[in-house]
Amino acid sequence: MAYQLIAVDMDGTLLNSKKEITPRTAAAVTQALARGYHVVMATGRCYRQIAPYMRRFPAMRYAITSSGAAVADCMENRIISSQNIAADTAAGVMRAFVGLDGFPIIFSNGEALYRPELLNDPQRFGMDAYVDNFKANGTAAEEMERSFLATPYPVEKLDFYFTDAAERAKFLARVQGAPAWVVPCESAGVEVNATGVDKGSGLQALCRCLNIPVSAAIAIGDSENDCSMLRDAGLPLAMGNAIDDVKAASEYVMPDCDHDGVAEAIERFLLAQR
């Protein structure tokens, strides 16, 4: 099988531990794009939040955003596939959060809405690495939860970051059985998407749009929310810093995010093809 596309998770995969793209990785991505391969960011971030990274690669056209809820054509600045959480389901999940020590984020129409208090003490919620991106590409919303619960609307995704894993466990217990897909992320975070929506469904939707068999796609990641696209891709790859479930779902383990794992994957499995 000749591979035509690689879907690349961002945090802990494309980005190193400093949230940077290394020179070798940038060069490999640029070379793959120049040779006509699709290099696709597959991320939990919304469309607006990936804009600074997309600008690094003018030839990069597509992105899987909000953990598969929205697939974007970045050159035409439009969403080509979207699957939102229903308003009543999103409201129920938000109500389950009320009273817990955490930080909610609403992803809607390519935007990330957050409470401005995030900027006061981001380290408390494990969000310090994301502050600059939120300042530049997020939308601060006063009394966000109260406003949303008063007038719910469909959303791409809900994220919650808690002070610790114990507080996250309380939330997970409350939303057990909710008609949504609830996936833990990072050390004390949770992502919520519509049922059936994940990075794997986003990858399938993009492949259909491009008329590419999903078996011709490579996927690489490090976290639990990457497992779905690894299961669907023709070649699943794990980063060296990946959790055990990701490594178990992969055919090969690349170096970690601080040692150019994505660059090696592109060089070895795309650029080396004849």
Region annotations inferred by a language model:
Residues E20-D128:
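Active-site phosphate-binding/coordination module
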Residues G36-V40, M60-R61, E156-K157, S215-A216, ...:
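Short active-site oxyanion
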Residues M1-L5, N16, I21-P23, V190-R274:
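Mg2+-dependent phosphoryl-transfer enzymes with acidic/Ser/Thr/Gly-rich catalytic loops
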Residues M10:
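Residue immediately C-terminal to the conserved phosphorylatable aspartate in receiver
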Residues G68, A165, G240-D244:
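Short, polar loop motifs at secondary-structure junctions
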Residues R61-S66, R124-M127, V182-P184, P236-G240, ...:
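Short hydrophobic/aromatic-enriched beta-strand-loop microsegments
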Residues F57-A59, S66-S67, M75, V175-A178, ...:
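Short, structured coil segments at secondary-structure junctions
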Residues A96, L100-I220, E224:
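Conserved acidic, metal-coordinating active-site core of Asp-based
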